[in-house]
A protein has these predicted regions:
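Short, glycine/charge-rich beta-strand/loop segments that flank catalytic centers
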Residues: 91-102, 120-133, 191-192
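Cys/His-rich short segments
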Residues: 114-171, 175
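Short, glycine- and charge-enriched coil/turn segments that flank and shape catalytic ligand pockets
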Residues: 1-2, 63, 138-147, 180-182
Length: 220
């Protein structure tokens, strides 16, 4: 049986130049990739840039540039970083590439066909910088402004029509998988934390946005 090993860095958000944190994450992933190759694994080591979202759109406008041009310039700096650090990555993915668009559209259509995506309305506290929604118990007030209690980032109340991924339907399947594959969650010290989180019930996930245009269009 082939021994395959896949590892990825976070695909970095190019709203600014690379910094020490990006270098740290990349080097850690590179160490794992090199070690697994020595052990005889077929390694696929990925890194890249996540180039869509409201934050990118706003930063591009702030710099008076088209979002794609803005991303082209900054993504190159992240790609150059892989050479400066002598990383052994096998691929560098950009979410603005046609191959990524094609993969997203294919996955979306499969999920629609299987009934795992549905259209509904969403309302909640949204952080542009975190690109995440927060529940009301995850919000606090500071100096008269609402912020995320988790990240400290400002949040705004948002209401919009959205497609949702039916994550709630996968709770039992995930719990069974964790039980049958005891080494799946590493380090093992985190296993109870993950299991307890899933046992509480997973919420369906909003997977589309109408509040900005810089993203992959929802397939028709």
């Amino acid at each position: 049986m082939d021994k395959n090993f896949y590892i990825t860095t976070p695909i970095y958000y190019p709203s600014g130049k690379p910094h020490m944190g990006h270098a740290y994450s990349s080097i850690v992933a590179d160490i794992f990739a090199r070690f697994k190759r020595v052990e005889g694994y077929n390694v696929l080591f990925l890194t890249g840039t996540d180039e869509h979202g409201l934050k990118i759109q706003r930063e591009a406008k702030k710099n008076k540039k088209d979002p794609k041009i803005f991303c082209d310039e900054l993504s190159k700096k992240f790609k150059d970083l892989t050479k400066i650090l002598n990383l052994s990555n096998d691929d560098f993915i950009r979410t603005t590439e046609p191959r990524h668009y094609k993969s997203v559209e294919e996955l979306w259509n499969r999920l629609v066909k299987s009934g795992d995506i549905y259209l509904d309305k969403y309302s909640g506290w949204y952080s542009v910088s975190d690109e995440a929604y927060y529940d009301k118990d995850e919000i606090k007030e500071l100096d008269g402004k609402k912020i995320s209690a988790i990240s400290g980032s400002p949040v705004d109340w948002v209401e919009e029509e959205s497609y949702f991924f039916r994550l709630s339907a996968w709770s039992e399947k995930l719990l069974k998988y964790y039980k049958d594959n005891k080494d799946f969650i590493l380090p093992s010290s985190r296993k109870n934390e993950v299991v307890n989180f899933v046992e509480k019930g997973l919420k369906d996930l909003s997977v589309s946005r109408t509040s900005f245009s810089w993203g992959i269009p929802v397939p028709k």
